[in-house]
Amino acid sequence: MDDLDALLADLESTTSHISKRPVFLSEEPPYSYPTGNHTYQEIAVPPPVPPPPSSEALNGTVLDPLDQWQPSGSRYAHQQPPSPSPIYSSSTKNSSASNPQDSVGSLCSRAGEEEHVYSFPNKQKSAEPSPTVMSSSLGSNLSELDRLLLELNAVQRSPSGFSAGMVSVQASREPLGSWGTEGRAIILSPFFQDEAESSPPLPGALSPLYGVPESNNLLGGKAGPLMKEKPKRNGGRGLEDVRPSVESLLDELENSVPSPVPAITVNQGEMSSPQRVTSSQQQTRISASSATRELDELMASLSDFKFMAQGKTGSSSPPGGLSKPGSQLDSMLGSLQSDLNKLGVATVAKGVCGACKKPIAGQVVTAMGKTWHPEHFVCTHCQEEIGSRNFFERDGQPYCEKDYHSLFSPRCYYCNGPILDKVVTALDRTWHPEHFFCAQCGAFFGPEGFHEKDGKAYCRKDYFDMFAPKCGGCARAILENYISALNTLWHPECFVCRECFTPFVNGSFFEHDGQPYCEVHYHERRGSLCSGCQKPITGRCITAMAKKFHPEHFVCAFCLKQLNKGTFKEQNDKPYCQSCFLKLFC
């Protein structure tokens, strides 16, 4: 009722200056329309039905004037209206329509050439007066309206509001004399929004919105419905005629104010100013491309939220801040799903996301026997979106290639880096093939393999050179046969006399200072070799002149007599007896 009170206040403020403006009340004949001379003409004979309009006329390219619809030979005579009925209309010169039957401008342009045409009240010319005459006083109308509104408040529910900005088109099935066929009288009037929404559309008739056919409704929605048909006013009126309805009172009050109303021109195919119409039909006509575009916009929004979430990871959220991007994304997905369902777009879920356990609509990733949202199929370690990159599975969790190799791939013992391709397993360790080489010379191992010492791998040559036993003669590694003597290993070819390099016969040798010698060189090294015969002294020996001699080999160098008495003379490292020394040197 607050809306009705506001309506009455608006009506009072609007009609406060009505006393300064004329109010025209006229009586409506059953087959008449206003002309430029402000008189009524009545059709003499019902004309034949005109042919259907051409396709050009329907498309709004050809404007048929109203005169073309008049049959030839029709004559109209002035007739007294049988009963008073107020008619209010307004038109402009520029009003035009594509079809005379569904146009407001055609009817108004045919009415006359004035800028604004108002119907003047005709005096009662009939012999018999009307049973009831409606009062033209504005006060009586207002009091009647107040009484009706009180009754309406007691009986019916209060309406939701009065849409003063909307325009309804009221069609009357009374035939118009000037058209020559059954037409519709078009009256512009405000209407209640609830009543308009509850009224059903009229099939096959003019569209309730500005006389456009319903099949060609440019707004794609359901416009305001037609108001109730006005009954034909004959000579007598009943109780219902005496008590006008709320709609008729509103029409009278609205049209009593001579405020110019601009004509509404509707061309079939375009509309000069689109009206706001809310309808479920408009929503159900959305195309599949529109739904796809909404999904693309949603994916772009998801990417923006992802970047926002990554940028805000390091910073703490202020107290009382906004909700998390995850909840906003869930809200967006839920609202999109409900909106698509309301619009009639079937969104069949392509599966349930393995991460968020929610249905998937749009792009889907299939991996590891599950379906995922693209933004939820991320690396378990770094939480980066995997997308179309390669990934590895570990314990049912996806990992990107970098993190998987970093976490689970074997490490090279040499460089400690992850092994991505080929691997060499040796010494209970793993190696890159290019990092498994000799620890001494750096050469790669050939078919002969490698040798291990102290956890390191060596080639054959370096291993024996470094760790194999060395020969006592040549100091080289002994690889095959060897001779063990003097606490040393010897190559067989290296175990010989260290002086004459003669192999030992029957394996017997003499040792001096840790080296093997033959008998001769052994005694020579030791000084036990007879200086006279150059043979080893195995028994008694005489030591003279820092030399050793067999007793029988120590003789005079001139007479060769044995010097057994123990006296001799030495001259030039040679022993002489005393008589020979005197003879030779004295």
From Swiss-Prot:
One of its GO terms (biological process) is endothelial cell migration. Pfam families: LIM, Paxillin. Residues 86-98, 310-329 have a biased composition (Low complexity). One of its GO terms (cellular component) is cell-cell junction. The modification N-acetylmethionine is found at residue 1. Its main location: cytoplasm. Cytoskeletal protein involved in actin-membrane attachment at sites of cell adhesion to the extracellular matrix (focal adhesion). Recruits other proteins such as TRIM15 to focal adhesion. This is Paxillin. It comes from Rattus norvegicus (Rat). The lineage of its organism: Eukaryota, Metazoa, Chordata, Craniata, Vertebrata.
